[in-house]
Amino acid sequence: MAFDKKLLDIVACPVCKGKLEYDKMTQQLICKADKLAYPITEGIPVLLENRAVPLTESV
C-alpha cells in the first residue's frame, strides 16, 4: 500500500508538533526540527515517539 501524501497536510511530529516531510527513498516521514524519522508501515505512518529513529548527519 502506498503512502498518501495528502496526509502531510494533517499529520505533525508527535514531539514538537512541527511539519513532517515525506522521504520517498527511505519510506519515512522526517521531522527536520527534531532530526527524527518515523516509519511508514503498509502505507500508515507510525507516529509514535518510541518508534522514531534519529537522523544521522549523512541523511
UniProtKB/Swiss-Prot annotation:
PANTHER family, per the entry: PROTEIN PREY, MITOCHONDRIAL, ZGC:162634
A UniProt-annotated Pfam family: Trm112p
Listed SUPFAM superfamilies: Trm112p-like
Name listed for the protein in its UniProt record: UPF0434 protein Shew185_1670
GO CC annotation terms, alphabetical: cytosol
Signal peptide coordinates: none
Naturally occurring in which organism (per UniProt): Shewanella baltica (strain OS185)
HAMAP family: UPF0434 (MF_01187)
Family, similarity comment: Belongs to the UPF0434 family.
Highest taxon listed in the record's lineage: Bacteria
UniProt xrefs under Gene3D superfamilies: 2.20.25.10
